[in-house]
Amino acid sequence: MEETQPPPQPKLPLCDSLMIWLQTFNTASPCQDVKQLTSGVAMAQVLHQIDAAWFNESWLSRIKEDVGDNWRIKASNVKKVLQGIMSYYHEFLGQQISEALIPDLNQITECSDPVELGRLLQLILGCAINCEKKQEHIQNIMTLEESVQHVVMTAIQELMSKEILSSPPNDAVGELEQQLKRALEELQEALAEKEELRQRCEELDMQVTTLQDEKNSLVSENEMMNEKLDQLDGSFDDPNTVVAKKYFHAQLQLEQLQEENFRLEAAKDDYRVHCEELEKQLIEFQHRNDELTSLAEETRALKDEIDVLRATSDKANKLESTVEIYRQKLQDLNDLRKQVKTLQETNMMYMHNTVSLEEELKKANAARTQLETYKRQVQDLHVKLSSESKRADTLAFEMKRLEEKHEALLKEKERLIEQRDTLKETNEELRCSQVQQDHLNQTDASATKSYENLAAEIMPVEYREVFIRLQHENKMLRLQQEGSENERIEELQEQLEQKHRKMNELETEQRLSKERIRELQQQIEDLQKSLQEQGSKSEGESSSKLKQKLEAHMEKLTEVHEELQKKQELIEDLQPDINQNVQKINELEAALQKKDEDMKAMEERYKMYLEKARNVIKTLDPKLNPASAEIMLLRKQLAEKERRIEILESECKVAKFRDYEEKLIVSAWYNKSLAFQKLGMESRLVSGGGACSDTGACTPARSFLAQQRHITNTRRNLSVKVPATTSD
């Protein structure tokens, strides 16, 4: 009997098998033949399904779908697909594609070469088995036909072998690669044994079917022969007849056929047992194949981990070198940190600007228009803050002036009260003398004339001239002194106020810049901590971002440090001018004190002369009537001065109320800005992932009003009190 063998399955080429594999993705564009794939649209859609994060919508939109017969557009699309695959291998997988695997794009687009197209599809297959969804893609490959599976497995093996040859040598990697090669060889052997067993089983099945057919035919022939035997029983008794001879001959054939049947039954049983053994071996080989596939997947995963670890180790070495450089740079900044720590109490104002700038930098890529509006708002608020601080400084200076004026007016009031008391005493004395004089005038009018003439004659003319001349000189000296000294003092005070304003502006700017330096140093420390924590686990992109952030913060820190040095130089330049002004004011104050002492000495002499004159007049005639016009003039002057004092007191109260209202407005504005600042800080802390800050470097910051009070107190200590000049 001839054994019929099944025809061998034709081995599909690489391009056709990979096209069958591409059809499992169910892309929008067709991928049935080579010409449909040369447009590059179907391959781009397959790459988008393989890794949508890398081959995103923006990358897919660059692939033109309306291609037609334009080979240039096809070449552009296929070139973009190849560039995307190369970047995916190099940047995401960290692998180098060997030159043997890179296809010729001109052959694909112009000639529709299936060999070059198969190389390109082989690279897409490598992307699928190395991406995050590789288990799903491997399961899809296992559902294909066996011939397609065999071609796909050989393509994967070729791709992995060429990748292994192009990768740099390493001891640990070499061992894993050897294990991977051994696993792949065992997998190939198992697949070959599986194929042989399958063919052998098919051959045995064919033999069993042929034997079964032969058995059935023999059984039917046996039945026919039995029927003929029953019909010819009567003729078989005579052995000399032809029928008997045929009967004996048929009986011999029947015995031979029975023996052959028994032999075939035994062979069938043997084949059945052998088939069962082969099925058991097939099941064992399938289990072994599954184990080898799992081992191959594990080795592939280990290879991926090795590649990732190799890339991360290289990046970690680079990061360690950069961290060492940054450590050296940070060690150079210790002196600056010490200076900044001493001035941290006055650096809270700059935090508003830094927080707003950080928020604007975070939202810059998302909303450019919002960034511009926020910048304008921050600038307006900064201008308002500076204007309000300047206004508060000016109001503090005005309040100080009003207080000095108030003190001068109080001194003038006390002096006027003393003069009023003395004038009251003299007025009472004059009233008494006037009553006596009236009584004397009623008795004798002529006596008064004689007394007046007598008093005028008795009163020496020299004393009168001395009194008048001293009064005139006293008034002229006071007017000259008040005019010149007041003008000079006002000029010096204006210069001093201008210097103080400049000093305050520079101090505020210095405070803001130092706050910015502190914030930038805090950010640098956070970045350094994050670099130290990540170490070898950090990816290339995160390390590059951290480097860029650190470089940007270092540049900002150097710029702010240069601005701070410039402002400190300006403050040092202004300091000697202030010292000179203070010396001039001290000299003028000493001169004023000398002149006040001279004036007091002249007033004492004048009072002494007046007392002597009064005593002389009293000794001459106690009933003499003094001039009542001078008393009325003094009363009018006293009333005018009291009215002026009341007006000044009312103006001082109004100024105090205005100052109080402005302070309330400033405090309300500050509370509102502080609330916005807290909200910004909370959002920044939430978005930053709770970055830890150096608690030792931070000191409790003063509020806005406390800072303004501190500035006014220091300014008040620096300012010079000018003594009020006494007026007539």
Swiss-Prot record:
Gene3D superfamilies: Calponin-like domain. Residues 12-128 form the Calponin-homology (CH) domain. Residues 503-512 have a biased composition (Basic and acidic residues). Residues 657-728 are annotated as: Sufficient for interaction with AKTIP and VPS18. Residues 169-434, 477-658 form a coiled coil. Residues 169-444 are annotated as: Sufficient for homodimerization, interaction wit HOOK2, HOOK3 and AP4M1. This is Protein Hook homolog 1. The gene is HOOK1.
